[in-house]
Design a protein with these regions (language model features):
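Extended, small-residue-rich solenoid/repeat segments and analogous flexible loops
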Residues: 1-36, 42, 48
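Glycine-rich hexapeptide-repeat left-handed beta-helix
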Residues: 2-12, 46, 51-53, 62-63, ...
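Conserved SET/PR domain catalytic loop and adjacent active-site segment
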Residues: 39-40, 131
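A cytosolic small-molecule/anion-sensing beta-strand core signal
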Residues: 56
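Glycine/small-residue-rich phosphate/adenosyl-binding loop
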Residues: 59
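Glycine/small-residue-rich loop that forms an oxyanion/phosphate-binding "nest" at active or ligand-binding sites
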Residues: 77
């Protein structure tokens, strides 16, 4: 379902995106090409001056919440996966090719390209450079913690690419099903 926010801003969604009927998208939200937004995802740019931009070929899986504080922006780079039940809260920038795992929380930070934030991790008030791995359950809230992060491995990169491929397949499949109805 799509709603305008109190400032009367409407979501702008690419015609090639697939949005579940149970997803809720509110306000100044831009969704790019071939994006998959799964069941019960909530994407809210309803606080004054907040905006959310989701790049091309992204997936926003079941029960994900994306929200921005007043006068903040959430930017999700192309080819990024937001896995089941994670929270991305603005102000926040996620670079291209990132993966945010199940139940992870990302708030008030800048995440570079090709990062893997694993399940139930918390990342807050830090800048993470390109190509790092935040381990399962890690709490990264000080810049000094970032120096301890491992580099992305080829296996990690392959995993991220496989998630994107599966979700692009879902966009195509669900789009084709909706044309049959």
């Amino acid at each position: 379902m799509q709603f305008q926010n109190p400032e009367k801003q409407q979501p702008r969604i690419s015609e090639t995106a697939w949005i579940s009927e149970t997803a809720i998208i509110i306000g100044d939200v831009t969704i790019g090409e071939n994006v998959y937004v799964a069941h019960n995802a909530v994407i809210r740019a309803d606080e004054p001056g907040s905006s959310i931009v989701i790049g091309d070929n992204c997936n926003v899986q079941d029960n994900v919440i994306i929200h921005g504080l007043s006068n903040s922006k959430v930017s999700v780079g192309n080819n990024t996966s937001l896995a089941h039940g994670c929270i991305v809260h603005g102000p926040c920038v996620l670079g291209e090719g990132c993966f945010v795992g199940f139940g992870a929380v990302v708030f008030d930070c800048t995440i570079g390209k090709d990062n893997l934030i694993l399940h139930n991790a918390t990342v807050r008030k830090v800048d993470i450079p390109d190509g790092k791995v935040v381990p399962d359950g890690a709490i990264i809230t000080e810049q000094k913690d970032v120096a301890q992060l491992a580099d992305l491995s080829p296996e990690d990169s392959d995993f991220k690419k496989s998630v994107i491929a599966v979700n692009l397949h879902l966009v195509e499949g669900y789009t084709n099903l909706s044309k049959e109805v």
